[in-house]
Amino acid sequence: FFVSRGVACPLMLKEDVVSGYTAGAGEIGHTVLSVNGELKCVDDLGSEGAIFAKCQEAMLAGRLPELKERMQKEGHLAMEQILEVQMQGDDEVNAIIDQAIGYLGIALANVVNLINPGYVVADSCLFSVEKNRQRLLEAAKGNFFGLNEEEVQIVFTPFDRFRGAKGA
């Protein structure tokens, strides 16, 4: 379960990556969730891109001054900056991330409930913060069906920005 600019959930069966008919299987970011009666892609709700967009919107409205200062100093917005501001206790950044991870947890639960894996590997800069890992576990397990909560192990791997490129 890989979260970056988008959300992917590559599927492996034994030691083989499962491929779809025309492309790779597991593009969970392109699946939809109903939010207040409106259908939205998981990428638009829980990806780093979604978090960036909400933070940028808040900065344009004059909020998140600490994040804006960091962004201007670095010349660009990065997930690491957002996480630093989150760890400093910024309520709005915490709310943005909490909501995004809530959607990611629902998406992950959908995958688990569909394929019933023995374990899931979660990888994201977002999960380098312990409370974000706990939030994902809470959101996912709260939507697991039956025994999945006890049976499915979610493993958080140390984040490596280039893991996707190395795997390709």
Regions found by a protein language model. Give the residues of each.
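Phosphate-binding/catalytic loop of phosphoryl-transfer enzymes
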Residues: 1-41, 48-49, 167
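ATP-binding/phosphotransfer module of carbohydrate and carboxylate kinases, centering on a glycine-rich
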Residues: 35-168
